[in-house]
Amino acid sequence: SAITAHNRRFFATSIACLGAVLISTSAFAQTPNRSEADPALLNVLNQPLQSCSQAPQTGYLRNGYCAVTTQDAGVHGVCAVMDAQFLAYTKSQGNDLSTPNPKLRFPGLKPGDHWCVCAGRWQQALDAGVAPKVVLAASSKDVLGSLFLDDLAKHAVDPPAHLPPPKLP
C-alpha cells in the first residue's frame, strides 16, 4: 500500500539521516564554496531550486542550496527555518545544531536561521509536533521520495496558490 511504501522510505531516510551527521560536517570542512545551484535542480514545486541560506552557508555541499547528491545519505533537502522548539528537539535526538563548532567552521544555529535538514529528521519532528517552517522554493524535489508535499506546504513560509498534482508511479 502507499502508506507502507511511505513508511519504508521514511525509515530508510531516518536511518541515513542519523548516519549522515558526521559525514555532512566532514564535507563542510572540506568543500569549497559555490554560490549557484545547478540550473537543472528542481524544488518541490517543480521550479528551479532557490538558495536556502548563504549566512550561515548551508547545504550538504555548503553552497547555500539544499541540493541532494548521491553522497548525501541523509537527504539534506528540506530548507527549514530554525525555531527554538526544533533546535531543542533535534538536540534531544543527538544532532546539536545550536552549539558552535569552530573546528568544523560551524557557527551554531539560532531561531530564524535557514538550514538544510534531513528529510527523515523533518518527518520525525512533524510526527512529534515540532516541525519547523519550510521554504518550498529552496527545498529539493528529492525529498518527495520520503515526505508528502501537502505536509511541507502546511508548514511553508512561502505557500503556493495551488500545489502541483502528485505524480503517480
Question: How would you describe each model-predicted region?
Answer:
Residues 142-169:
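Glycine- and charge-enriched low-complexity intrinsically disordered segments
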